[in-house]
């Protein structure tokens, strides 16, 4: 990705600077290519993004699929987007409908899909601008130069055949040295041979394209933001009426997933979704607040007494009609 090797390129950067998407792909590209970065506003506003593109004549636009969907929901005919040439997208899979609208409605002749984590920053897989729509919507591109990737059986660590699913592992200079002051967590994430365990379920095809299929752990991906259910669960446990709580991600057309809190109340207690949401407001990040609050009597359990979150997720989606 050389931005046409033109230092006069201007990039609209609405993605947060506390993620590698903004801090590394933004700052590094500015340092290496001499491009101009345009920050639409101090927070996030799809309208401010479009105003910045128009006033600053931006050529490239960064964003997650959700950010692009928000921009597409505005009255685009009010803005001059003729300067736009391309988009860089990451954070979560992009629905085909959004991809097509970006090309037709926002003048993005080229759209590049990227994948990476903060631990192997900034990206390890990247698509080609001229990839087919199928490759752009179903894969995250090919492995970057000087980086290795493999998909292994998480149970035994053996490499699985092409096309088969397993845990994606990454090795290269992009992999972090470790988590600050947390050697145990570092050992869990990076093996002795310096392979980083992404925790993602993925597959590689014969052309080297990677398809991300889900999370091994229970992480929720809401609009490109990674949310750990345990963090929300721990907070909700502090509510005096809550006996037990499990948080799962349920399907959402715009954000990919939404946070659903499944709560078992203390005996004799009553509550409401509004009460739980009010309890969360101002105490946890807005994007981590439960969108749905469902009160349950029990949870699906394994023979050993562990909660089957996959079955709980399915039950909640069915109950909510998703």
Give the label of every model feature segment.
Residues 150, 162-176, 195, 201-202:
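AMP-binding/adenylate-forming core of the ANL superfamily
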Residues 1-10, 18-60, 74:
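Conserved AMP-binding/adenylation subdomain of ANL enzymes
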Residues 8, 35, 50, 58-63, ...:
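Gly/Ser/Thr-rich phosphate-binding loop
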Residues 66-68, 94, 175:
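Alpha-helix capping/helix-boundary segments
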Residues 61-64, 172, 177-181, 185-188, ...:
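AMP-binding/adenylate-forming catalytic core of the ANL superfamily
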Residues 138-144, 159, 190-193:
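Short Gly/Pro-enriched turn/cap motifs at secondary-structure boundaries
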Residues 7-8, 84, 192, 290:
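Phosphate-coordination loops involved in phosphoryl transfer and adenosine-cofactor binding
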Residues 314-322:
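Acidic/polar alpha-helix N-cap and adjacent early helical turns
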């Amino acid at each position: 990705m050389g931005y046409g090797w033109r230092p006069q390129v201007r990039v609209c950067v609405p993605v947060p600077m506390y993620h590698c998407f903004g801090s590394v792909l933004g700052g590094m590209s500015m340092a290496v290519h001499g491009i101009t970065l345009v920050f639409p506003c101090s927070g996030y506003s799809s309208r401010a993004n479009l105003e910045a593109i128009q006033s600053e004549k931006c050529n490239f636009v960064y964003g997650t699929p959700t950010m692009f969907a928000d921009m597409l929901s505005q009255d685009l005919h009010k803005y001059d987007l003729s300067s736009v040439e391309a988009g860089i997208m990451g954070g979560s899979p992009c629905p085909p409908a959004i991809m097509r609208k970006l090309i037709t409605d926002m003048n993005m002749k080229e759209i590049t899909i990227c994948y990476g984590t903060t631990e192997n920053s900034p990206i390890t897989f990247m698509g080609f601008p001229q990839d087919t729509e199928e490759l752009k919507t179903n894969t995250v591109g090919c492995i970057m130069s000087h980086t290795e990737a493999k998909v292994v059986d998480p149970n035994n660590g053996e490499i699985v055949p092409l096309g088969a699913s397993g845990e994606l592992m990454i090795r290269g200079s992009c992999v972090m040295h470790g988590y600050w002051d947390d050697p145990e967590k570092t050992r869990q994430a990076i093996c002795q041979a310096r392979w980083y365990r992404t925790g993602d379920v993925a597959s590689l095809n014969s052309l080297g394209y990677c398809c991300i299929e889900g999370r091994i752990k229970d992480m929720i991906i809401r609009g490109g933001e990674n949310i750990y259910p345990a963090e929300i669960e721990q907070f909700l446990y502090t509510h005096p009426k809550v006996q037990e709580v499990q948080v799962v991600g349920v399907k959402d057309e715009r954000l990919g997933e939404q946070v659903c809190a499944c709560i078992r109340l203390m005996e004799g207690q009553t509550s409401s979704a509004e009460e739980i949401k009010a309890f969360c407001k101002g105490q946890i990040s807005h994007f981590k607040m439960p969108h749905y609050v469902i009160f349950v009597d029990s949870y699906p359990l394994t023979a050993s007494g562990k909660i089957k979150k996959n079955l709980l997720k399915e039950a909640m989606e069915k109950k909510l009609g998703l």
